[in-house]
Each structure stands twice: as structure tokens, then as C-alpha cells.
Amino acid sequence: MGETKVIRIEDVSKFVGQTVKIGVWLRQKRGSGKIAFLQLRDGTGFMQGVVSVGDVDEATFKLAEHLKQESSFYVTGEIHQDSRSEFGFEMAVSDIEIVGESEDYPITPKEHGTDFLFDERHLYLRHQKPFATMKIRDEIIRAIYDFFHKDGFLKLDSPIITDSAPEGTTELFPVKYFDKDAYLSQTGQLYAEAGAMAFGKVYDFGPTFRAEKSSTRRHLTEFWMIDAEMAWMHQEDSLKVQERFIAYLIERVVDNCQVELKMLGRDVEKLRAYTKLPYPRISYDDAVKLLQDNDFKIEWGVDFGSPEETFLAKRFNSPFFIVNFPKAIKAFYMKRPPSRDDVVISADMLAPEGYGEIIGGSERDTDYDYLKQQIISQHLDLSEYSWYLDLRKYGTVPHSGFGLGLERLIRFIAGEDHIRETIPFPRTLNRLHP
């Protein structure tokens, strides 16, 4: 008889009726005097192992009875299909081979507070909810690369250490760069514009840092951002790229992460409906009027906060765009429409169900003198932006782009209440550990 085949839990459906071996950790266990039910995980999925007195020797049964939570071991047994099981399959265990015994595990099978779970995040990642969320995160990341590759974009890596604030903000993390002052990047967008002038369509994807003293459920101080920039493209075509992009990412998760979505209690059919295009649009002007008509105390020229975005999101049953924001509340590089000087050709995409903004974008201004004046009027250091202005001196073209916050998108698709659930080790106003 040959050696027992070692497999992974995600592949058990291929081995029904066969005896296999799996390297696992013990999530938890229950049982009576003659049977033990082992809840197992291996990093690819979850399943149950059943240890019965009549099927194993006395030593193996005692070993199963005394296993501690998160002990690691090889488990051998026959795979059975079982519709009553949460996972559809279980193993009739015949042998257990201990690899690493566990001490008393701190995250016991009971209710724990959020602060405790994130203090123990290095262990909490092993549990079912973060497992499902990280699998969805992984699928979205792979889908992002696939979308841009298929759409003819080049991956451009923007620097993380910069000498300026791309959007003129003061919410920066300073770092010492030898004898100079530098900052952790907030966005790679300006560098992506340079890339678009060289390669046509580019995107970057990496960590960004914002020193916002905000502790809302939508803010992280370190998060992952996608910046896409497209030469020879006006805003209307950019919006079409954006909605195709989001619909594709949702579709990939719906197609490939149904088990994980079920673990999180997410309605798959509701998500699938969000892939229907085109997405609705409402102007900033009309959004303000709608809010005012519904007793919101908001004036034209003010940016929307969470209550306003939540209200607007409930008016639509899909992601939607708010277009043409006031110039005063947007970045200096955004283009103005020919008919108005008080707004810019910009758009934010908001997710439905009150999840808020997931994309921000605009058509970029190509007027050298106007951009130079904008930089000066916003009290930015002109010398730090000389390279950016060069892009308008040497063959400028119409171009547009957008930025997507990865964790905000994951929060929406996974249905998470708080954004800290969407990244392995969150960094927030009050959390820098572990």
C-alpha cells in the first residue's frame, strides 16, 4: 500500500471515499465520551473531523480528547460528503500526528471585545471572519491586476517617500531623509500623470499614508491605493472605465468567493445586481439641493460628510457618481468646465448601503499658467512642483484619472461594519500594534 496522499482542505471534494492526510490546526472541539468532533482549519478552508472510539485505538482517542485549541497536527482519515455539515464534507479520523502543541490559547470560543481582538490580531487572523475577509481582499487584488492588464495599462511604481504633498494637505507623516525633510506619500497620482505622458495608460498600486486625526469607521492612517491615469481621455470616458472596473471587481468576488461571502452573511444576489451598468449620476448642485430639501443643514461649497453620503446612497440601488464638485474643495490640478469657473470636472463614486466614497477622480487641467497660479495661491512650494509643470510644457494632452481606496472597496463588498477589518494589521489614530 502506498503512502497516504497529503491534501488541502480546499481540495477535499475531489477525494470523497478516499483516505487522505491533512496538516491542520484545531479551531475548537466538542464531544461526549465515545466521540470527539474536531473543528479543523489549514489556511485554505475549514472542515470537521470525527474521532470515534470504535474507529481508532485508545491512545489516538485520548490524544483527540486532550488536544488544545490551535494545536497543529497531521490528521488522517476518510473523506465523507455530509449535507448536514456546515462545510459539506467531514473526515472520519483514523490517526493524529502532533506537530506543535498549543499553550492555553487567549482567544477562547466566547464573545470578546474589539480592542482585545485587535490587540491579538496576529492570532485573530486565524479565525473564520478575518479569514473570509482576507480571502476576498486577495481576490480583489488579483482582479485589479487582471483588469488593468487586460485593458492595456502599464503598472508604474510611484515613490513612497516624497518631498511634497501631492494634494496640498498638511496631513502628512514626516520622515528624515538624510539632511532633508520628506514625507510618506499620500498618493502616487502626480507621478502617474508623468507615466501617462510616457506610456498612455498607467496605474500604480501601493501603500499610502494620511495623518488624519479621524477615528471613524471609514478611516485608516495606512491603506492601499490604486491610482489610474489615462492620456488622450476626457472625464466622460474615464467614468466609463471606473464603472467597468468596479463592476468587474464585484463580479470576480461573487464568482470566486461565495463561501467567504456566506461566512460573512453577505447577500450574493444583491452584490451581483451592483454589476449592472451604467451607474447613476447626480451633480453636486442637485445633491446639495436634495439634501437641503430633506432638512440637512448644508450650504453649497461644503464637502459631504458621512451622514450626507449615507442619505444620498440610500437613493440609489447601485454604486453612483456625484459629479462636478466646487473648485474650492478639490485639488489644484483639476480642470474647470468651459461654462463655469466655480466647479471642476470631477467625480466621486459612492457605494450603496451607506458605505460612502470608494473612488475619486477628475479630468486634469492642461493649462501651464493656470496650474502655476493654483500652486502659488494654495501656498505650495513652486520649486517642488516644477517637474509636474514640465508635463504641460512638453506636449501636454487631455488626460483624466482616478484613485480607488482598496480597503473602502473591500469594506463595501464584504459588508464589514468597520474598515479596520479589511486589512491584516490596521493602522489607525489609536493603533500602532501589533
Swiss-Prot record:
Superkingdom of this entry's organism? Answer: Bacteria
Keyword Protein biosynthesis among record annotations: yes
Q: Provide the GO biological process annotations.
A: asparaginyl-tRNA aminoacylation
Single GO term (MF): ATP binding
* InterPro entries, alphabetized: Aa-tRNA-synt_II, aa-tRNA-synth_II, aa-tRNA-synth_II/BPL/LPL, Asn-tRNA-ligase, Asp/Asn-tRNA-synth_IIb, NA-bd_OB-fold, NA-bd_OB_tRNA
Keyword Aminoacyl-tRNA synthetase in record: yes
Q: What is its main location?
A: cytoplasm
What CDD domains does the database record attribute to this sequence?
AsnRS_cyto_like_N (cd04323), AsxRS_core (cd00776)
Signal peptide positions (record): none
Assigned EC number: 6.1.1.22
GO cellular component terms listed in the entry, alphabetical order: cytoplasm
Q: What UniProt keywords apply to this chain's record, in alphabetical order?
A: Aminoacyl-tRNA synthetase, ATP-binding, Cytoplasm, Ligase, Nucleotide-binding, Protein biosynthesis
Query: Which subcellular locations apply to this protein?
Result: Cytoplasm
PROSITE patterns in the cross-refs: AA_TRNA_LIGASE_II
Catalytic activity line of the entry: tRNA(Asn) + L-asparagine + ATP = L-asparaginyl-tRNA(Asn) + AMP + diphosphate + H(+)
Q: What do we know about how this protein assembles, alone or with others?
A: Homodimer.
The family assignment reads: Belongs to the class-II aminoacyl-tRNA synthetase family.
Q: Which NCBIfam families match?
A: asnS, PRK03932.1
Q: What is this protein's record name?
A: Asparagine--tRNA ligase
What is the taxonomic lineage of the source species? Answer: Bacteria, Bacillati, Bacillota, Bacilli, Lactobacillales
Gene that specifies this protein:
asnS
